[in-house]
Curated annotation (Swiss-Prot):
It is found in: Cytoplasmic vesicle, Secretory vesicle, Synaptic vesicle membrane. It comes from Rattus norvegicus. Potently inhibited by L-vesamicol. It is a multi-pass membrane protein. Gene3D superfamilies: MFS general substrate transporter like domains. This is Vesicular acetylcholine transporter.
Amino acid sequence: MEPTAPTGQARAAATKLSEAVGAALQEPQRQRRLVLVIVCVALLLDNMLYMVIVPIVPDYIAHMRGGSEGPTLVSEVWEPTLPPPTLANASAYLANTSASPTAAGSARSILRPRYPTESEDVKIGVLFASKAILQLLVNPLSGPFIDRMSYDVPLLIGLGVMFASTVMFAFAEDYATLFAARSLQGLGSAFADTSGIAMIADKYPEEPERSRALGVALAFISFGSLVAPPFGGILYEFAGKRVPFLVLAAVSLFDALLLLAVAKPFSAAARARANLPVGTPIHRLMLDPYIAVVAGALTTCNIPLAFLEPTIATWMKHTMAASEWEMGMVWLPAFVPHVLGVYLTVRLAARYPHLQWLYGALGLAVIGVSSCVVPACRSFAPLVVSLCGLCFGIALVDTALLPTLAFLVDVRHVSVYGSVYAIADISYSVAYALGPIVAGHIVHSLGFEQLSLGMGLANLLYAPVLLLLRNVGLLTRSRSERDVLLDEPPQGLYDAVRLREVQGKDGGEPCSPPGPFDGCEDDYNYYSRS
């Protein structure tokens, strides 16, 4: 009996520790921060998986053609070689790299470069676009699903699908499996990205906390895109193809387990929390003119980045005889102005929240000017400055308009955010689905200069459209159905809705300050007539 006493004490101590940790995890403020960490890790993983294949797939597909597996190592033989990738950008690898790379070799073991053929370039472009294409197709379904199921279960589903996709990448031996894994990642992203951003908007309902939290999420997205290519390239060369994907799979699994511990999505309390009001249907949100303006801005501002990534390397080689390291480094400095743009917009939004539309319009103008300047650059340094301006403008637009979407849902619809952020994800996916496939054809038929000028002009022309959002900050926040049901007797809800509608029709006071798209029937929650 004596040995059981220490065992019992250990169990009691473990139980107390578990209860203490559980209580700490359930403390509202701490739980909100943990949820932000979980979502940021999920977004980081998604973007790392999106970009980690940049240095791996072209060489791997070329090795499939050659009949060998993994990177070819050459010992004690000097050969011109591509340096390890150092940036979050697919251009240096997606473009046709048939010209000889600049030699900076050594006599040590190095990764022998294998350049994709023209048909393999098409395969690589389709592979990169497949993720965004499937994401584009699934988002109209994932948004309403998130509205109905709350945010934690779809986020868990997304992390699980991303885990499966990453494992498939690790063990893929042919192009079909790579394509299936890439497409599966798009399915996971449609759930994880949308539910994650929606969860942040739900957990941080007030400004400036909401803008700050969404800004942190955007910084993690940018960092994931930056760190993934060198992470993948170094591990691929020294540890093999499977290792970078298995590391990402392990982090994805850990994030899912942390979500289970913090949110407890299958508990009775979680099911009670999931009893949300019925969200506005996604097709009705798409018809909301304010939301349509924001979605158009998100698509327009991301088109230059999505179209320049797969084309700028070839243009640099032909225009300025750029070396491989220059093509690899050209996007790296842009991370700093992107984070600076996020920080600046968050600080400005905290002091002047009614000017979010202006920050977005300035961002579009900066993107437009930067895109138009790119073809005029004839050396490396001016090109870096132009691309830094491009990413700075994208940060302004994203950081200003993502919180605006949540605010529009709060004041014009029901405060359920799955569908509206599915629309935002659709906006991004349109650009990144077209970029890897269409950009090269436009360059071949019209030229790189015309492509850049066209994208810049589109952003400059769209900037004044955001003037239509200038009165959004003056709208009165509506009370959600959940709040009404808590504060009002059930029999009075219908009467309150009818009274408000009658006042509007009889020429009573308007529901909110007038705007170009305003009507009283739109300023009250759509659920009253669903």
